[in-house]
């Protein structure tokens, strides 16, 4: 399952196990922000959502920082038009648009595309498989995403896993 894949993946800052103080600091921030974001979504606290989303943008290292990749994975499923959490779209939009100058140009473009539900083909396929909820083996699709960049794929999958958790919380029968 996705949990097994992510728990054994050490490339993501969400799972950082090393002793680099800088990475440890970012990893701690990412985990704290992730928990806060999930809490705000569950409590439907739309007032504070843009502020938390802004803190994710640009957080991490590389061409597409971990915080950005996490948001891309989260939005891929959570902001589907028929999803009960689609009501949070304006908050994600506001948070990302206000903070896109905090990240790399390529990541800013990726985040904007994610707001429009535009993803690379393998992510689109994975989302479609999850929406269709057919009893097919999607493990190969998870692995394809996992292999994107040095940590981008695993960071996106962390976001997707949280989106699936929240979908279960909000009631998955609303997703078309």
Model-derived segments and spans:
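Non-transmembrane, aqueous-exposed alpha-helical and coiled segments at domain scale
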Residues: 1-176
